[in-house]
Amino acid sequence: MVTIRADEISNIIRERIEQYNREVKIVNTGTVLQVGDGIARIHGLDEVMAGELVEFEEGTIGIALNLESNNVGVVLMGDGLMIQEGSSVKATGRIAQIPVSEAYLGRVINALAKPIDGRGEISASESRLIESPAPGIISRRSVYEPLQTGLIAIDSMIPIGRGQRELIIGDRQTGKTAVATDTILNQQGQNVICVYVAIGQKASSVAQVVTTFQERGAMEYTIVVAETADSPATLQYLAPYTGAALAEYFMYRKRHTLIIYDDPSKQAQAYRQMSLLLRRPPGREAYPGDVFYLHSRLLERAAKSSSSLGEGSMTALPIVETQSGDVSAYIPTNVISITDGQIFLSADLFNAGIRPAINVGISVSRVGSAAQIKAMKQVAGKSKLELAQFAELEAFAQFSSDLDKATQNQLARGQRLRELLKQSQAAPLTVEEQIMTIYTGTNGYLDSLEIGQVRKFLAELRNYLKTNKPQFQEIISSTKTFTEEAETLLKETIQEQMERFLLQEQA
């Protein structure tokens, strides 16, 4: 028989009393009523906040979006395959936030800021809310510095400034992503941090973009946020806000950032899916009533900071895909009304071999020449008008056989202007090269050449100017104006190169 020793028992009781902790921990919990299609209905969670993160028993995280009288609608940030009916859920008391740091540069991450490039964890000492309020009126200043895209058609006629929001819109396969990626490539050496957000894209397309950046050395200053087409709708909905939070981190550190959303219409579709499954009432095209707010609160975060905040900037280029050129659909009209202008890419121009296929007539930048250096204003001021007149004249000339000499000359000039706007992909031009190209076209130096010779002549002229007249580039970059000296140098170079070119062609 086991003897009971009173002293041992009293020691154990004494130890337990000493270890007793009077701290009371209140956890807001609930029970899963129903789960499926990335949505869970929870009973309980009485004091949960809208947008608060909740944690399921098996570790999945969700966001409480619908707070109803008898249950809470939660969207899952994962597949949630192990969640069972009746399992417990606890509120975390936190709103979605991500870690941020310089270490994110050169990495590919998902909407939760977790690396997906297989290169290990990313160290970060601070975090930022995924949804931060946009800067107010006082903390902004008007856009005045250019953000060079390296594309003549944009920088000369639809200029983009630092802190602007410019929509890139067009049908599928018209080169929208190419315009955006070329803009990122052109930021090399410009001290601009770039964030590329891929929402609902094919994984192969994202891999292709990342490979291009790596080959051209652009990943050094770029962060790629990717949620591919097979990701849960919740993560596709969050990805743009994650990208914006990362760009804001640099903007508030007095840096310049460029963020590309490719594309917000996929985000709207993911949000529509979530909203319909949460049984929110559908509106136009079955989108929920707050789909405008979805995009406006995202794009309003792009800004040019005031001098008191360090004059950092965040430039946003959302890309929206249209169906057979229909710009009047719901999402395109929403985004057009939020942004400061749009670059319209046309399938007809693309198929006609005009690439980038920018329709200059209906593209617009509401910031205008404020986002150009003086030299570009001087040279490119009339080119948009000339091209618009040429397009009108060309349409009219199709019905008329006998045209007078002046009209024929105007048509010839317009065709050459259109030719000089063509550019190969991933071949951005410096602002000095653009000024030289436009000046050559608008002043009639190309009129004597055949249309097929224009691009070859311009490429040779750029090389000749760089090697023989480097002072031209120095004048433009130092004074930012197209001085008489620069014009004289350029005229001499064009004449010398024209003689050399014509001799080569005759030989």
From Swiss-Prot:
Recorded catalytic reaction(s): these are: ATP + H2O + 4 H(+)(in) = ADP + phosphate + 5 H(+)(out)
Task: Give the enzyme's EC designation.
Answer: 7.1.2.2
Annotated positions binding ATP: G170, D171, R172, Q173, T174, G175, K176, T177
The EC category is translocase
Q: Which family does it belong to?
A: Belongs to the ATPase alpha/beta chains family.
Site note Required for activity, residues:
S363
Q: What is this protein called?
A: ATP synthase subunit alpha, chloroplastic
Task: Report which gene this protein is encoded by.
Answer: atpA
* HAMAP family, per the entry: ATP_synth_alpha_bact
Under the heading InterPro entries, the entry gives:
ATP_synth_asu-like_sf, ATP_synth_asu_C, ATP_synth_asu_C_sf, ATP_synth_F1_a_nt-bd_dom, ATP_synth_F1_asu, ATPase_a/bsu_AS, ATPase_F1/V1/A1_a/bsu_N, ATPase_F1/V1/A1_a/bsu_N_sf
**Chief localization class?**
plastid
Q: Which keywords are on file for this protein?
A: ATP synthesis, ATP-binding, CF(1), Chloroplast, Hydrogen ion transport, Ion transport, Membrane, Nucleotide-binding, Plastid, Thylakoid, Translocase, Transport
Subunit comment for this entry? F-type ATPases have 2 components, CF(1) - the catalytic core - and CF(0) - the membrane proton channel. CF(1) has five subunits: alpha(3), beta(3), gamma(1), delta(1), epsilon(1). CF(0) has four main subunits: a, b, b' and c.
